[in-house]
Amino acid sequence: MFLKNKNIIYTCVISFLLILICVLAKADDENRNHRLIISEYLSNNKEFASSFIQYSNVSFQEGKFFLKKNRLRIEYTAPTQIVFVIKDSNAMYYNIDLKEVEYFNPKNTVAKIFFDFFYNEKFLEDIILNNEEGSFSFIKKIKIKDEINNINIIFEKSPVKLRKIEITNSEGLTSFTIVNADYNPNLDDKIFSLANPLLN
């Protein structure tokens, strides 16, 4: 009787483990498929422009976002006019209203998150996928200057479109909602120049 009960328990445990393995394998396949979808989306859209709405600490800012040739340009248009031009190892901050220009290394700033998302193939390696009905998102933790930044990037499913980037850290939640994306903007290379605009 004891052996019979032991065999039943053993069979139940094995069955549970097999089901668990199947579920985990399916989830792993789903993660892999979504990584491929995102990689393909990013590789097919090496040049695009969009407007965005940024929400941070109960304040809203509007702006435009441009991407081309391993460079990013972020323009804040309201309420303050500020421009960032970012490449891998150098970036420029230009406050149009105050006529101030500063250069900085983006690797130790939140700007690194944007650059790595679009240009670093390893960025997607350790993401956690969340699959919703009409969208999917992935979560990733990034350490910058000993601070953990929780990143949540949200995509519309059909067709695949980047919709929102959320960054949560000690300063709270900052979200960037992407609107009016243009995937064939024919951007002028000059807008990505790191030359001091006050000297031109």
Task: State where each predicted segment sits.
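Short hydrophobic/aromatic-rich beta-strand segments that constitute the beta-sheet cores
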Residues: 50-52, 72-76, 91-94, 138, ...
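An acidic-aromatic
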Residues: 64-112, 174
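Boundary at the C-terminal end of the N-terminal hydrophobic targeting segment
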Residues: 25-29
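A short, Trp-centered hydrophobic/proline-enriched beta-strand micro-motif
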Residues: 40-60
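Short, solvent-exposed helix-to-loop capping segments enriched in aromatics
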Residues: 109-122
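Gly/Pro-enriched, hydrophobic low-complexity segments
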Residues: 122-200
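Bacterial N-terminal signal peptides that target proteins for export
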Residues: 2-13
